[in-house]
Amino acid sequence: MWWDILTLIALLVVIMGLFSMAMYSIGGALGMDKDTISAISYIGSFLLSISAFYIYRNVRNGKPAALRTIARHRTSPQMLLWSFLTIVWLGIALEPLVSMLPDKHFASIDALVQNSYGALLSIIVAPILEEWFFRGQLQRSLTNKYGAMVGVTVASVTFGLIHGNPIQILTAIPCGIVLGFVYNHTNSLGAAIFVHALNNAFSFAAISILGSSGITLCDMLEEYRTIYWIIYTSSVLLGAGSLLIMILKLRKKQ
């Protein structure tokens, strides 16, 4: 079990690391701007990782996600909306913890929003490639062998850690659990991609409007403390409750 998991994660880390280093060296020599190099590195490394996973799973007689799983049935608008709102509620619940992190971590997120290709990468490219990789390959492969809880947990933790930024790690792991539930429940990458894209679009728009990822709901409602605590308490209860329901549903599929 652990050999498979470590091999899959190592493939991702090594390929992304080596390809990114190669692109920055080649791009720098060719005089390419940093935004373009970052975009090519991100897209190229994920495409190579996906290809490597297909080869590895075929060798191990696994069943990687096929393109036909992009569109499947059993997907209701209510479930997609609930999943998106759960991510928002969990994000609000984690704000006090996230706000304690150094400003430099917020600056790196702001830089992504200001990137020339920021909107394209965040709202379109990232949801497609990341869901195809983490849910469609890593989660599905592990679920087929070890069950839904192992598949979702490992894929979610890896999904969070691969972001690198402590802020994104804290928020991406629970987000990954929600997205893992969506994929497991619907067997549709399209559903997971949609929720991921909706969340990224919401976050991108909020940061663009507010001017910084470091501005919290608490900051915005500084003069309306009662309203803030009502929203915050509700978000904690709804987010934790929804996440618990999703986890219990996943456990039933073990």
What function would you assign to each model-found segment?
Residues 11, 15, 86, 147-150, ...:
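Alpha-helical transmembrane segments of multi-pass membrane transport proteins
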Residues 1-69, 76, 201-254:
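N-terminal, membrane-interfacial amphipathic/helix-forming hydrophobic leader that caps
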Residues 116-254:
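Transmembrane helix-loop-helix hairpins at the membrane interface
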Residues 26-39, 62-132, 139-140, 144:
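Juxtamembrane helix-loop-helix connectors linking adjacent transmembrane helices
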